[in-house]
């Protein structure tokens, strides 16, 4: 099957039919050309004209089935700072390490990294290891540190 556009999103329009999922790594959401297999074994070639993909995008809808995109469940940390000081220290340390993060409500989400637990303990911030489907790609902003 070949698809080249998004026809809707599950969060806005829940299909009443069977949903076949295409699972992507979070960094594949920005890719325009992909070849994937749904969780029901259907081959799908994705060639997007412009935009990338978003969690829940519907790529195909037939009489009895819809094909939608979701990200893979992956290990992550959810960090819950209790004060602005904890938030500031956590944000500083994550930024200093160039660790991409997502902030939703009062929580910070980062992909699992075995070195981060020690950092969170040192800061004294509340955190837990969990699994999460990241709904959007992390944004990397490359730059160089100059020490003259």
From Swiss-Prot:
One of its GO terms (cellular component) is cytoplasm. It is found in: Cytoplasm. Keywords: Chaperone, Cytoplasm, Nickel, Nickel insertion. The keyword Chaperone applies. Its main location: cytoplasm. Pfam families: UreE_C, UreE_N. CDD domains: UreE. GO terms for biological process: protein folding; protein-containing complex assembly; urea metabolic process. InterPro entries: UreE, UreE_C_dom, UreE_N, UreE_N_sf. It comes from the Bacteria. One of its GO terms (molecular function) is unfolded protein binding. Involved in urease metallocenter assembly. Binds nickel. Probably functions as a nickel donor during metallocenter assembly. HAMAP family: UreE (MF_00822). Belongs to the UreE family. This is Urease accessory protein UreE. The gene is ureE.
